[in-house]
Regions:
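Conserved class I S-adenosyl-L-methionine
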Residues: 1-40, 55-59, 150-179
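Conserved SAM/SAH-binding beta-strand->alpha-helix loop
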Residues: 76
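Conserved SAM-binding loop
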Residues: 83-84
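Conserved SAM-binding strand-loop segment of SAM-dependent methyltransferases
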Residues: 91-105
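A short acidic, Gly/Pro-enriched loop at the edge of an enzyme's catalytic core
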Residues: 108-117
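A short glycine-rich, Lys/Arg-flanked "PGG" loop and its adjoining helix->strand segment in the class I
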Residues: 133-145
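Short alpha-helix
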Residues: 207-223
Length: 248
């Protein structure tokens, strides 16, 4: 049973929408920070590398309606389909393209050059340095000269309890005490039990990559990006970074 869960964690979550319903508020806050840090411009082109169920679209919808061009890419059919469906629900399907691809394989978007590439909790699932290096080379190959790479990856301090604590606080501030009570006692116990603790276990076993600040910064630099910003997010359980491609 545990082996099945490990192999099908993402696909089951995307297909059932459990991933959407159980995601903690702190996770959404990290997405909001990513969107707030994007450059201005209505014609911006953005690749969401490892788009999952397309949750980032919730926070990009207004920008997309104003002219942003969005491409979502995920390894799983269930993620690609969920992203397409979300784009329909948000009324932005005509400006959203979805493709299926592995980050560590040549990307099927080589005719497009993106202003921004976002990897929100995606590259860390490639545990080996070599695979992540190859994935970053792939992403760099589809970016505009001096394009921006925006990454969010878990840190060595990943802590399921702190993520839940911060999420309850954020929900209370944003939606009031009744919603916070509902999340605390009826939603977040499942979030922690079948989501966050599983991820924490994968990180501690080295199956997925957890970063120190130095490792996170160095991965940008080794891939040919000048680091412009690094910040702890997700209750101190992840790093958000922005790097600009260094002109040759």
């Amino acid at each position: 049973m545990e082996n099945f869960f490990s192999k099908n964690y993402w696909s089951v979550g995307f297909q059932s929408r459990l991933y959407d319903h159980l995601s903690p508020e702190s996770y959404f806050e990290s997405m909001q920070k990513v969107v707030a840090g994007l450059p201005d411009g209505n014609s911006l082109s953005l690749l969401d590398a490892g788009c999952g169920s397309g949750l980032l679209l919730r926070f990009l919808a207004d920008r997309i309606k104003e002219g942003m061009i969005y491409t979502g890419m995920d390894l799983l059919d269930s993620g690609v389909e969920a992203t397409r469906q979300r784009a329909e629900e948000l009324g932005i399907a005509e400006r959203v393209t979805c493709v299926q691809s592995d980050l560590a394989s040549p990307l099927p978007v080589d005719a497009v050059k993106y202003d921004v590439v976002v990897g929100h909790f995606s590259l860390y699932t490639l545990a080996s340095d070599e695979l992540r290096k190859f994935a970053l080379e792939n992403l760099k190959s589809v970016m505009q000269p001096e394009g921006l790479l925006v990454l969010v990856n878990p840190s060595v301090n990943y802590d399921a309890n702190l993520i839940i604590e911060q999420s309850i606080q954020l929900v209370g501030e944003r939606y009031g005490p009744l919603v916070a009570f509902f999340k605390q006692y009826l939603v977040y116990p499942f979030t922690k039990a079948i989501g966050l603790r599983f991820i924490q276990k994968q990180l501690r076993l080295g199956i997925w990559k957890a970063y120190s600040r130095e490792e996170f910064t160095q991965e940008f630099e080794r891939a040919g990006f000048e680091v412009q910003h690094v910040e702890e997010v997700y209750a101190g359980s992840a790093f958000w970074g922005i790097g600009r491609q260094v002109a040759n």
